[in-house]
UniProtKB/Swiss-Prot annotation:
Taxonomy of the source species: Eukaryota, Viridiplantae, Streptophyta, Embryophyta, Tracheophyta
Disulphide bonds in the chain: none
Protein name, per record: Tubulin alpha-5 chain
Site positions (Involved in polymerization): Y450
Catalyzed reaction equations: GTP + H2O = GDP + phosphate + H(+)
InterPro entries for the chain: Alpha_tubulin, Beta-tubulin_BS, Tub_FtsZ_C, Tubulin, Tubulin/FtsZ-like_C, Tubulin/FtsZ_2-layer-sand-dom, Tubulin/FtsZ_GTPase_sf, Tubulin_C
UniProt subunit comment: Dimer of alpha and beta chains. A typical microtubule is a hollow water-filled tube with an outer diameter of 25 nm and an inner diameter of 15 nM. Alpha-beta heterodimers associate head-to-tail to form protofilaments running lengthwise along the microtubule wall with the beta-tubulin subunit facing the microtubule plus end conferring a structural polarity. Microtubules usually have 13 protofilaments but different protofilament numbers can be found in some organisms and specialized cells.
Amino acid sequence: MREIISIHIGQAGIQVGNACWELYCLEHGIEHDGTMPSDSSVGVAHDAFNTFFSETGSGKHVPRAIFVDLEPTVIDEVRTGSYRQLFHPEQLISGKEDAANNFARGHYTVGKEIVDLCLDRVRKLADNCTGLQGFLVFNAVGGGTGSGLGSLLLERLSVDYGKKSKLGFTIYPSPQVSTAVVEPYNSVLSTHSLLEHTDVAVLLDNEAIYDICRRSLDIERPTYTNLNRLISQIISSLTTSLRFDGAINVDVTEFQTNLVPYPRIHFMLSSYAPVISAEKAYHEQLSVPEITNAVFEPSSMMAKCDPRHGKYMACCLMYRGDVVPKDVNAAVATIKTKRTVQFVDWCPTGFKCGINYQPPSVVPGGDLAKVQRAVCMISNNTAVAEVFSRIDHKFDLMYAKRAFVHWYVGEGMEEGEFSEAREDLAALEKDYEEVGAEGADDEGDEGDDY
């Protein structure tokens, strides 16, 4: 069995987690208390959904997940929420004082006290697996817990489970909307360890998702619940092939193999289609070519950067629902002829497609319409560097004056770590620039950097 353990860190990670598990439960017909009326074989572990749920002797299905936060309020909402009986109390780990938007607190002082407990819980989940495939890590890098404790956990997971793949779903600070003044510091420090300790990281950005909700779903003032439900659709589409059987299944390690040309170039853009409200869906037919075109639209990217400014190195298209390979091939052929979608010249094929016959589910009373077919795209595009250069610029403005740095140093960090992380990101921007440069023959010395 190829199990996956999900780790939700900090407020953002936990709230995205709530949306994801709500959706998984719907898709598999699992009730709020973990029972699954349709599952007649109690205790038999070969069902596909067992990659994400473990089954107890009494026929209860428990998510293979842990939720960690340095302060209790967000986790208390899970403890008292409608899915409180789904999780084992040991899976919900909360500390007493929060990281106060400070990477150093999350990584050194406060986080250090809780990280062993987390790893202990992860080990229990891992012992319960017959063939652990890897980890999905959910966090935001703007705050203190998601960035600090997030990177600490990733570093420790690399030590304990070196060969297992780690996929990150990481919420990056938005260009305009900011929830903390020190976001650029936390993001740069955290990305420094994401670079080394995740195999694939999918960048998400609230502002981009706000815009999608406003534009496509006609929600005037989107809430975090609206955003998270949209994010959960993407994550669900990515993991569909692990949880259901389909025509062309895609494994987690396959993402890595197909999307990551060089170890450091592993930050992905994601998009999903159709994002459409129930009123509109009634009048539209949404064929495979239509939704395929839609995921390549710059406006449907879940991070604020324009793929037309960069080149695609690879992309993964995950279709679900009423889709046959013939339609997919035709749609992909059309995309290849478009001038707006440019591939680097050293990667001519560039498409990996997966098809799953399980149609997309939607949360009842949610914003998305129930549709027959949907597609989720994860793409590796050199334009992602825009996200980093934006954050780097803000970092530089503050760091030039050493503003707010004393908060970090006071928690046991050294100033050198700032410049080290910043240099690492500068190198990353340069890597992206080189990868997108014309002509592959002058890049023979790529290998020395890693």
